[in-house]
Amino acid sequence: MSRSLGRLYLVATPRPDQPEAEFLARVEAALDGGVDTLQLRCKAGSPQYGEARPYIALARRVGALAQARDVPFFVNDRVDVALASGADGVHLGQDDLPAEWARRLAPGLQIGLSTHSPEQAARAQAEHPTYFAVGPVYATPTKPGRAAAGLAYVRHVAALCPAVPWYAIGGVDLSTVDDVVAAGATRVAVVRAVLDAPDPARAAADLLARLPDAWEARVCR
């Protein structure tokens, strides 16, 4: 099923020491607060979800939360987990399986792509993904060792007015989101700003309130 992309995209990553019930409760709260696109990202080598079967089991539980709210659900990197869990799509990084190969393996999956430079953004648009991500806007511990692409990269992509939806990602939170929107982003993706907040539902609602409305998110500014 193809679900409409939203404006506030949560990349949900369980901590190594986090009980699954707590993780699921925080994801559910974030969805209730307004997260309208969701990705599950389990890091390679995770002691809990490094193997396919536990990753698939968690993806099915997270996907059920998204499906109940008609929110599009993506799995990071793993085409096999996305297929086995019934996800809407898979998100692929620059070092992951090429989008063309993913389409051959799973023609029905939507595809999201990470980009970190104008050249990568141009290539991403040529591959016709469901969406692509632009960042990291700011340095973030989620991607250690990766230099920030900065607001200049957001402005560059916004000026292109891509036909493909795109999300600004990397260090986006309540202290930075206004600058990211001013640079031209109408959609943002977050990790810690929502999932690590004391109240994920409130954090999501507060971020969503700072984004352009759904109609503006469909047009260039």
From Swiss-Prot:
GO molecular function, one term: magnesium ion binding
Keyword Zinc-finger in annotation: no
Organism superkingdom: Bacteria
EC number(s) reported in the record: 2.5.1.3
Residues binding Mg(2+), per UniProt: D77, D96
Cofactor, how bound (note): Binds 1 Mg(2+) ion per subunit.
Catalytic activity: 2-[(2R,5Z)-2-carboxy-4-methylthiazol-5(2H)-ylidene]ethyl phosphate + 4-amino-2-methyl-5-(diphosphooxymethyl)pyrimidine + 2 H(+) = thiamine phosphate + CO2 + diphosphate; 2-(2-carboxy-4-methylthiazol-5-yl)ethyl phosphate + 4-amino-2-methyl-5-(diphosphooxymethyl)pyrimidine + 2 H(+) = thiamine phosphate + CO2 + diphosphate; 4-methyl-5-(2-phosphooxyethyl)-thiazole + 4-amino-2-methyl-5-(diphosphooxymethyl)pyrimidine + H(+) = thiamine phosphate + diphosphate
Residues that, per the record, bind 2-[(2R,5Z)-2-carboxy-4-methylthiazol-5(2H)-ylidene]ethyl phosphate: T140, P141, T142, G171
Pfam family, one: TMP-TENI
Keywords: Magnesium, Metal-binding, Thiamine biosynthesis, Transferase
Biological-process GO terms, alphabetical: thiamine biosynthetic process; thiamine diphosphate biosynthetic process
Cofactor list: Mg(2+)
Signal peptide extent: none
Pathway(s) the chain acts in: Cofactor biosynthesis; thiamine diphosphate biosynthesis; thiamine phosphate from 4-amino-2-methyl-5-diphosphomethylpyrimidine and 4-methyl-5-(2-phosphoethyl)-thiazole: step 1/1
Enzyme class: transferase
CC terms in the record's Gene Ontology section: cytoplasm
Residues reported in the UniProt entry to bind 4-amino-2-methyl-5-(diphosphooxymethyl)pyrimidine: Q39, L40, R41, C42, K43, N76, S114, K143
HAMAP family in the record: TMP_synthase
Family: Belongs to the thiamine-phosphate synthase family.
Function description: Condenses 4-methyl-5-(beta-hydroxyethyl)thiazole monophosphate (THZ-P) and 2-methyl-4-amino-5-hydroxymethyl pyrimidine pyrophosphate (HMP-PP) to form thiamine monophosphate (TMP).
Designated name of the protein: Thiamine-phosphate synthase
Species the sequence originates in: Deinococcus geothermalis (strain DSM 11300 / CIP 105573 / AG-3a)
